[in-house]
Design a protein with these regions (language model features):
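Generic structural marker for isolated residues within well-ordered, non-membrane alpha-helices
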Residues: 1, 42, 183
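N-terminal, positively charged regions that mediate nucleic acid binding
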Residues: 1-14, 20, 107, 130
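Hydrophobic/aromatic-rich, well-ordered segments within soluble, folded domains that form packed cores
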Residues: 1-5, 90-92, 98-99, 215-222
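Glycine-rich, mobile lid/loop segments that gate access to catalytic sites or pores
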Residues: 21-22, 47, 55-212
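Short glycine/threonine-rich loop-to-helix capping motif typified by GTGT followed
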Residues: 28-36, 204-221
Length: 222
């Protein structure tokens, strides 16, 4: 990251590193004007923290950021909808820090927003496996925001669903079927109201997905 930003202040880096015995694996996406010598940088880092870099085998698998992901970062959702305010022109990825806790607000003893997100993802899997929405791809995720009155959930404020799809779909029809077959059916305790904001693929096109577009480790993601 440091070297990429030194060479190109506008660089984008999403890289995972795994170390096991005498092997170092570096994988991910880098978009940078300069060519980075990853093995050399890894050896320098190993030496800096007190290891002999000659004892390690280094394997790097780096490619450019997915064009679908880049499309959401290059230009924000608001900008794509015509908002020219300076503070909304730059897009952003969907990185976040997630935490959880036990609670009595659901049968699963999990926070209701997480329960709804799990249900949506489960229904996405079912719709893909059963072929109910044939345009679906295997990659996807969901996030739900619930408004509370004290400790009591009151209404669903926002639902975000990013799901891989085949190219050339009818977006409006696709979104409506997702809402009726997946999203609405997952939210039972609190119904979606007219003020609930539902965002489906807010970054735009999501044709490139899975390992072809993203790099990740089990239980750990940038």
């Amino acid at each position: 990251m440091d070297r990429a930003l030194y060479e190109d202040p506008a660089a984008r880096v999403a890289v995972e590193v795994m170390a096991i015995k005498a092997r170092i694996y570096v994988a991910g996406e880098i978009t940078c004007k300069a060519k980075l010598e990853i093995p050399m940088l890894v050896r320098a880092a190993l030496e800096h923290v007190g290891y002999d870099p000659r004892r390690f085998r280094i394997r790097a698998r780096i490619h450019c950021q997915s064009s679908d992901i880049a499309g959401g970062v290059d230009k924000s959702l608001e900008a794509r909808h015509g908002d020219t305010s300076s503070h909304v022109m730059v897009g952003a990825g969907d990185q976040g820090t997630v935490y959880g806790y036990a609670t009595a607000e659901s049968e699963e003893r999990l926070p209701l927003p997480l329960v709804y997100a799990h249900r949506i993802c489960k229904r996405l899997d079912q719709a893909f496996t059963d072929g109910k929405i044939p345009e679906l791809g295997p990659d996807g995720k969901a996030q739900v925001t619930v408004e509370y009155d004290g400790e009591t959930p009151k209404r669903i404020a926002t639902i975000v669903v990013s799901v891989q799809h085949k190219p050339g779909i009818n977006v409006e029809d696709f979104n409506q079927r997702l809402i009726s077959l997946v999203i609405s059916a997952a939210c039972r305790e609190i119904e979606i109201d007219e003020h609930t904001e539902i965002l489906i693929n807010p970054s735009g096109r999501f044709v490139e997905g899975g390992p072809a577009a993203d790099t990740g480790l089990t239980g750990r993601k940038l």
